[in-house]
């Protein structure tokens, strides 16, 4: 996938950074990548700070990854220090009511759950 990069800042942690636009075209690759990361790491952070657009297939893949992580006793977290249009997709879809998220990379990589976003 051209628009994602995976980094491993600490043992057991993976950060998948989304750049540009994310839609139906790369759905299957994204699902496979998220499944693998959740299986192999205790914390997976999906970083949308460089994303320009996300569609419902991306949001659904994130929800599925979160459910898989919870079943395995692992953590899945969003980093949403991002553009207003991307944040709006998360807010309007209701995804933020179901997923752990923060606006801070340091908080996203920490052990404690981030505080909810406050307007």
Task: Describe the residue ranges of each PLM region.
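ABC-family nucleotide-binding domains
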Residues: 55
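STAS-like cytosolic regulatory interaction modules
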Residues: 1-52, 64-119
